[in-house]
Amino acid sequence: GLDGNKGDYDKFYHNVNGQMIRHREIHNLYGMNMTRSAFEALQEICPEKRTLFFSRSSYIGAHRYGGIWQGDNRSWWSHILQSMQQLPALNMAGFLFVGSDTGGFGSDTTEDLMLRWLQYALFTPLFRNHSADGTREQELYRFDNVQAAAEMIKIRYALLPYLYSEFL
């Protein structure tokens, strides 16, 4: 059976044009093709509208169809640093619409970590606060320093015309 480990990728195959291919050889292509298919379908259905897609599983070239979200992270200082380090690498790979879960997804964020993450994330194209069930509710109004968060959100709103023109 499948155990959820890397060895499982050797145990199942996909039929690609009549050829059986191991999943591990096309794993990231799956995410890219899902994004591409959705993008192309919406272009056909409503070509006059701009669309926005982002995925956490992707492949080189997928930047033509959407952005990339850096995946489930933790509410840890090391993960905000990791996000900052990944961003330029993703940019060099062609992914310009990039971002992480502001404040962290898993674990309980602190007010200080959330404010620092906001300061960083307000300059990233993908900007969202998203957390796992069972973690601290991390909507900005739940923290004491709502005014500091509000000031950062004002900066983000001021950047929206630029971000829209560059990324959408």
Descriptions of predicted regions:
Residues 1-168:
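Catalytic-domain carbohydrate-binding cleft regions of carbohydrate-active enzymes
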